[in-house]
Regions:
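Exported/periplasmic ABC-transporter solute-binding proteins
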Residues: 1-35, 39-228
């Protein structure tokens, strides 16, 4: 299994280098890439995740408003004292462009507000590296970063960090499933529409939408998608 960034994964699917994706919603450019090549895609939500903000465990701040999160990443808020914390400069980590979490950050948090440019040293290439840096940045509580809920809580558990509530709502399986936590996003299974009915990719795509498939997804630690 080759892991690539979300946008690059869609390129691979459109080019026939991949048969099935389990991914977050892509940038519009990824869908346009497939359309330009005459490739129709089938996207089916199978679970739900969320963008979460993490800080050093010693940081006294426990919650940000949505406006404060935008303020930090637009460069308008630069000190923790402006959001109820100590008088310390905020060191705001970002993800690399084309990563799923960066796409989510721009679409769900920043929306039409431009993100402040971050130097290369504040853009770790991998999510695990970002978490490590937030946990250990000069042994202080200055740092903040963002990742996705499943990765932080299931794949890369790390002492020294904590998740922030947003508007007083702590991210959890329950608040993400219900949509109460504001930065939720579905995770999709994606195949090409012309994938043969008896191919392994099509069979798995269909299986993940069954009750047994949903049970398996939940047993793996993912948030169960609530049927409308």
């Amino acid at each position: 299994i080759t892991h690539t960034k979300t946008t690059e994964s869609f390129y691979a699917l459109a080019d026939g280098a991949a048969d099935l994706l389990l991914v977050y919603a892509p940038e519009a450019s990824a869908l346009e890439y497939a359309e330009d090549r005459g490739v129709e895609l089938l996207m089916q939500p199978i679970t739900r995740d969320a963008l979460v903000f993490l800080v050093n465990a010693d940081n006294p701040v426990t919650s940000l408003s949505q406006e404060e999160a935008v303020g930090i990443y637009s460069g308008k808020i630069t000190n923790w004292s402006e959001v109820g914390g100590e008088d310390r400069p905020i060191v705001a980590y970002q993800r690399v462009e084309a990563s799923g979490s960066q796409v989510m950050m721009r679409a769900q948090v920043m929306k039409d507000v431009e993100m402040v440019d971050a130097p290369t040293e504040l853009r770790p290439g991998e999510m695990g590296e970002l978490i490590d840096r937030v946990a250990s940045y000069k042994n202080t509580a200055n740092a903040i970063g963002y990742s996705v809920y499943y990765y932080v809580t299931e794949m890369y558990l790390r002492e020294g960090v904590k998740l922030l509530a947003i508007d007083g709502v702590q991210p959890s399986n329950e608040t993400i499933a219900s949509g109460e936590y504001p930065y939720c996003q579905d995770v999709y299974a994606v195949i090409r529409a012309d994938e043969p009915e008896d191919s392994p990719a099509r069979i798995l795509f269909d299986y993940l939408q069954t009750e047994e498939g949903r049970d398996l997804i939940e047993a793996a630690g993912y948030v169960r998608l609530v049927e409308e």
